[in-house]
Amino acid sequence: YNWGAGAKYKLSKRNVIQFDYSGNNYASRYKYLIENSGYLPGQYALTKLQKFHDAELKGIFGFTTNSTTVFGADYRCEVLRRPDSDLDKSVYTASAYGQHEVKLWNHLTGVAGVRYDHHEQTGGRFTPKVAAMYNIGNFNVRATYAAGFRAPGIDELYYHMFKKTMGTRATISLGDENLDPERSNYYSINMEYRTSRFSASVTGYLNYVKNMVTSKSTKFDDLPEAEQNRLREEFPEIGDLSSTKNLSVKNYFNFEKATVKGFEVNLNGNLFPGFTLAGNYTYAYGRGLNEGGEWQNIERSIRHTATITGNYTHSWSDYTLNLNLNGRLQSKVYYPGDADGNAPGYGIWNLNTRHTFDGFRNFVIEPGIGIDNIFNKKDNRPLNKNFALYSPGRSVVISLALRLK
C-alpha cells in the first residue's frame, strides 16, 4: 500500500510554497502448505519488506515576468528487510536544488539548475543541468546537458542471500559495501513538429557513466575449489541441493566506465474523427568496460523496442465505445557472462474495449472486456533460463467500474 499528503501556500499569484510527502510499503510473504522450518500449514513467513519515504519542500517564484525560479529540499529514506539474507538496513538521501527558467526572446527559452545529493553510505555530489529550447511555428528544438548521480541500492550494497528461483535454479547474491556511486554526463537533442492533428519527434542522446553498478553471474561449479568451500560454509543450504549444476553466484561490481547512446522516434496522428494512431521506436546501445578491461553489453539492456497503439472512440447518445489495440515488440535482453544465456525477444498484442453507459441520474457504468496476448505468445524454454516474456499465454480480461456523478 502507499499513501501521501501535500499542501500549498500561495504567497501571491506567481509565488507558491509547496510541501509533499509520499510513502510506500511493500511486503511479500510465503504461505506454507506443509509443516516446514518450524511453520505449520497455513502460516506465513515474511520474505521481503520494503519501505520508502519521501518528503519534499519547494518554493516556486516568478521574480520577473518572463522567468520562473524553483528552490527546494528533499529527504528520502529507504528500508529493506530480507530475513533470508539477514538483511535489515535503511539508508537516507538528503538533497537541495535550485533551477531558473527564463524566456530570453520570443522564440528562445533557457534553463539552468544545480542539485546536491548526499547519500548516507556513499557521500554527496553536485550535479548541474543546462537546457535550451528554440521554437518557431510548429517546430521545437531542445538541447540538454545534465550531470547525474546515483548511489548503489541497498540490495547492491548488502545482499548476502541464497534463494531458490524457478524450477531447479538457485542463486547466491553477494552485495559489496565498497561499491562506488554512479556519476554520469548526459547530452541530448530533440526535434519536434506538432500540429492539431499530428505530431512527430526525434531525440538523440549520449550518456557517459563512470562507476556504473552492474552484476555478473557465475556457475558455482566453475568457481575455484577454495571459493566453493567458503560459500558452502556461509550458505549451508547448498548442502540441501541434489546438484549444484543449476546454482549461480551473482556478484555486484562497478564498471570502470560505460556508454549508452541511442535515439527515440515518436509519431502520433488523429487520422479521422475518433481514431488516434501512435507509435514509438527506441534504439539503445549500452556497453560497459568490465574488470577484465573488455567492453561488454550492459546487463538487462535491450537494443530495439517498439510500441504501437490504435485507439477509437465514438458516442451514440448515452453510450460510448472505446476500442484500443496495442502492441509491444522488443529484441533480446542481454545477460553478458551469464551461463543461462540471453532472454529472447518477443512481440505481444492486446485488444481492450470499454463501454460507457451514461443514461443514469447518479452514476455511470463502465464494463470492459479484452484479450491480452492475442496471438498466444509464450516462452516455453526450461525454467533454468533467463526470461523476458512471462505471459502464460492468451487470456480474457473483464472489468467493471462504477463512477458516481
Residue ranges and their predicted role:
Residues A146, T276-Y283, N297-K405:
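Conserved C-terminal beta-signal and adjacent last beta-strands/turns
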Residues Y1-T122, P128, N135, S201-G204, ...:
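Face-selective signature of the C-terminal outer-membrane beta-barrel domain
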Residues A5-Y9, A55-F61, A96-V102, V130-Y134, ...:
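Residues on the lipid-exposed face of transmembrane beta-strands in outer-membrane beta-barrel proteins
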Residues S12-R14, G62-N66, W105-T109, N135-F139, ...:
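Outer-membrane beta-barrel channels and translocator barrels
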Residues D84-L87, E120-R125, Y134, N138-Y187, ...:
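Surface-exposed extracellular loop regions of Gram-negative outer-membrane beta-barrel proteins
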Residues G42-K58, S95-Y97, D180, T195, ...:
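Outer membrane beta-barrel strand-and-loop segments of large Gram-negative receptors
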Residues F19-G23, F71-C77, A112-Y116, A132, ...:
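Transmembrane beta-barrel strands of outer-membrane/channel proteins
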Residues T65, V70, K103-H107, L206-Y208, ...:
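Gram-negative outer-membrane beta-barrel transporters
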